[in-house]
Structures are given as structure tokens and as C-alpha cells.
Amino acid sequence: RVMAEPHIVLRTSRLAKCVGERFASRCIDAVMAGVSFTQIDVLDEARRMGMPWDEAVGFDHSSALSLDMLSRDAMLEGATFMINDEVRERINIADMAFSVDRVVSRLSECMTLRIGDLIYLGAPEQFEVKIGDNYKVAIGDKVLLNFDIK
């Protein structure tokens, strides 16, 4: 069983270590659309055995990322996730548990962010993956990802 999670993805533009929230916006230069995939049965087994989750979330083709990038401000318009042209989820930055600046600041405390690092912002929902489905992710009115599940 595989589940998909749509994301707004941030690209870092500079080296960042212990960046305060008020300066975090300076560390992001672009946003992209992403979808991550998780093998739920493998994840459940790893959790049950107290093992790492790597195999459940880090397999071949476990993530899709748009090639096109938009300016940082584009994320304020939010993202739309569609399956077979039906809107399944709208991701609004303002509805997230933590602000983007808080996420970037906190991550920079845990690890050094490097130029070009990608930050997949949390996804509110998961969707069961079915062969033959078409996925689209748009930020604002621009479709950045459009692919079929095979």
C-alpha cells in the first residue's frame, strides 16, 4: 500500500546555520511543487519492530519534484493537488501549524542548510496511490507537476 502526500517545496539560496525567524525569508529563493510517496505497510512494520523508516520513505521514485520554480512569494497563493483533474486538497501556507520562517529557522538550528537544499513543507493529507491516476500540483494558477502513476 502506497500513499501520496503533496507538498510545497522550498529551495534554499544560502548557507544557513542558526538563522533567526526574522531573517529566515532571506534563505529561500524559490518554491516548487512536490509529491512524496510512503509505503505504509513497510512503515508500519518498521515502527512495530523499532527500526528506521528509510525503506518506507526512501525507495526509488519515492518523490516527485517540479523542474519549474517560482518566486518565494508564489507560495502565498497556496497549492492545489488534483487527482484525475479533481481537486483533492488545497494547501494554504497560512493554515500550517508553523510559519515557513519558523520551519526554516528551526531546521537551521538542527542542521546546516546549504545552497540548493530542498525543504518539503508538511502535507495535511495522504492519498492512496492507484495505478492509472493522473496527479497535478499547481502553485497559484501554474501547474508545476503533471504525471501519471504507472
Can you describe what each PLM-predicted range is?
Residues 1-114, 118, 125-150:
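Catalytic-core "active-site belt" of small-molecule-metabolizing enzymes
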